[in-house]
């Protein structure tokens, strides 16, 4: 399994300036609650961003709805546009949140069909060679 590391977009940027990993997936769109830093520092870099716990709302499996400061639709679309839809992967915060809600949140953005397909599975299939 891959190593899990928590860091800021600025820390990731420093690493990327030193090394060029073959494949790197950054959870939570590259920096949870640091969306502007992601836009400024990481978009366009040779990394993947996943959508887990980043956009929409979180409803835990026990039914409780928690209001977290997740990014709004304008910021999500700005990151996807600047970074490129080819490098964004759909993700959920499962098992802590409801997967169907995460799907509904992304579907609700009304992204162009090609962009939606890439994010919702085509990119992951290409990355994993399946």
Predicted regions mapped to residue ranges:
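Active-site core of metal-dependent hydrolases
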Residues: 20-30, 48-59
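Divalent metal-binding pocket/active-site signature
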Residues: 1-40
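Histidine/acidic-residue-rich catalytic or RNA/ligand-binding cores of hydrolases
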Residues: 7-11, 34-44, 59-73, 96-108
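Acidic (Asp/Glu)-rich catalytic clusters
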Residues: 14-19, 38-46, 77-84
